[in-house]
Amino acid sequence: MLQVADVAASSGWYQRALGLRSGHGGDEFEMLFDGDAFVLQLHRLDAHEHGILQSGAEGARGSGVSLWFEADDRPAFEALVERARGAGASVVEEPHWNPLAHHHEATLVDPDGYVVVVNSPFEMPT
């Protein structure tokens, strides 16, 4: 669950940039899906249903958190990066080969400052 300032705006970003779909909607809470798979919850920062989340309010939101979304294959990865770019996503690290992880990846930042990495599947070294 990510704490966000504006649930609708954040939900819209994940839908436009990554192709996720809304499964709940609302001003305080959202559930996002990839097809039938539940992948992410958004919760308004100042809503109080989960008071324990407020303990993180002292630090910068997004600090120490990164989300990873793996595409089905390399063409799907490239299409996902272009989709995110077309949706106005901030691409802070262009697509590149990560030799340690053996995949291609790109780094985005969502409207609340969370790091979002999209990557291709693991490619067996030859």
List the predicted regions and their residue ranges.
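Vicinal oxygen chelate
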Residues: 1-5, 31-34, 54-126
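Core segments of cupin and vicinal oxygen chelate
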Residues: 2-49
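A short, acidic/glycine-rich surface segment
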Residues: 48-55, 125-126
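Hydrophobic pocket/interface hotspot
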Residues: 10, 14, 77, 84
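N-terminal beta-strand motif that seeds the catalytic metal site of vicinal oxygen chelate
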Residues: 1-11, 64-67, 119-126
